[in-house]
Design a protein with these regions (language model features):
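Membrane-embedded alpha-helical bundles that constitute the cytochrome b-like, heme-associated redox core
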Residues: 1-222
């Protein structure tokens, strides 16, 4: 299946609005005082979850493209990755400003003594580096080093999942689900399930077996 430029533009606009919707709902709930008894915790939880969801969606683009043969999916990956960074940054700002009141002493102690905060901060730094180098101009300047740098998105995904698992104290169902999705994406990347899913999809949709699309080099950008 191919998509023309007009369809891609419309898709990007829709994706932009969809990715922005969680923030709008979050701010609306904050204004309406509907964040519950602990609004700061609610802001942290919801922003962090959306950062992880969008990061996993970014990682899922390449497997979906390989299974379906829909090369146009790659055109949306950079936006997903940048939104993942945006929500991760929002999550961190809420922690710095509302949770810790910009008390750098407390923040330093947290980074040293709370491993889940340290690993979450590491994930944010990786996403920051990827977002800062996501433009085509930087891609051309860095060359092969750019490709190697953007492979770190998988480490960011792993650190984010561990951050969530480490944070939860009792109910592991939701972070466990995200961990399972990440594991499946990594298994696909290693080629253990790619061929079977690809064959089933193409047989079902009667797609040609030799259909190939050029591979993009980035996980957070086109």
């Amino acid at each position: 299946m191919r998509a023309d430029n007009k369809t891609i533009i419309i898709g990007r606009v829709l994706l932009f609005l969809l990715c922005l919707a969680p923030l709008q709902l979050l701010l609306w709930d904050a204004v309406q005082q509907q964040l519950g008894a602990n609004p700061v915790e609610a802001l942290l939880h919801r922003s962090g979850e959306w950062a992880l969801r969008l990061l996993l969606a970014t990682l899922a683009v390449t497997p979906l493209r390989r299974v379906t043969g829909w090369g146009w999916l790659l055109r949306f990956r950079r936006m997903l990755g940048l939104y993942a960074f945006f929500y991760a940054l929002f999550h961190f700002v809420v922690y710095l400003w509302l949770d810790r009141g910009l008390s750098w002493g407390e923040i330093g102690v947290d980074l040293l003594q709370r491993p889940y905060i340290s690993i979450g901060f590491a994930a944010l730094l990786i996403l920051l580096a990827l977002a800062a180098t996501s433009t085509k101009g930087v891609m051309r300047r860095l060359g092969r080093r750019w490709t190697a740098l953007h492979q770190w998105v998988y480490a960011a995904g792993l650190f984010s999942v561990i951050h969530y698992l480490w944070l939860v104290k009792s109910d592991y169902r939701e972070p466990g689900l995200y961990a399972a999705i990440f594991l499946l994406l990594m298994l696909f990347r290693m080629g253990q399930v790619k061929r079977r899913l690809q064959h089933r999809f193409r047989v079902y949709f009667n797609a040609p077996q030799n259909m190939t699309f050029p591979e993009s080099r980035s996980r957070i950008s086109e």
